[in-house]
């Protein structure tokens, strides 16, 4: 059992949604993803004037076009789950970034990847300089879903 807490993000900074898992090479959410997504639904219900972008990212494996399509389908999968949970579609934007926005290492990443340094950018070129085990850890870090607050005025000015 684990607890998921999402601080309401500043408008300029994306927030990683921990524990979102997809079937390999697919956009289907695994059952293990529901806890984190249910917490996000609660956060959105507590903040009804917020609109967000759900951003999905891939590792560098596969070609750019394929990764962009896969990440878009994954972001849409999260949006569908949130809509089923009662969140208005108007408040949600799905965006797949493929491998175009590699993760920049921060203090949180260092907890699971202490061989990295804060500020490292997990590009394909950088990752290929690491050991095979470290490469897989970095690829897993790049395979992520984040949300970013777009507006805090939804429904205020009708």
Residue ranges and their predicted role:
Residues 1-51, 90, 108, 112-113, ...:
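Periplasmic peptidoglycan-binding/tethering modules of Gram-negative envelope proteins
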Residues 57-158:
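Periplasmic OmpA-like peptidoglycan-binding domain that tethers envelope proteins to the cell wall
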């Amino acid at each position: 059992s684990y607890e998921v807490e999402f601080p309401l993000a500043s408008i300029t900074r994306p927030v990683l949604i921990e524990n979102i898992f997809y079937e390999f090479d697919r956009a289907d959410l695994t059952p293990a993803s529901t806890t984190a997504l249910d917490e996000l639904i609660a956060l959105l219900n507590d903040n009804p004037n917020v609109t967000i972008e759900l951003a999905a990212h891939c590792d560098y494996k596969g070609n750019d076009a394929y990764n962009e399509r896969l990440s878009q389908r994954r972001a849409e999968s999260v949006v569908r789950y949130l809509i089923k949970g009662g969140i208005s579609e108007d408040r949600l934007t799905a965006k797949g970034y493929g491998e175009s926005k590699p993760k920049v290492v921060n203090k949180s990443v260092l907890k699971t990847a202490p061989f990295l340094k804060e500020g490292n950018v997990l590009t394909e070129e950088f990752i290929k300089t690491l050991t095979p085990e470290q490469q897989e850890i970095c690829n897993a870090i790049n395979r992520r879903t984040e949300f970013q607050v777009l507006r805090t005025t939804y429904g205020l000015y009708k």
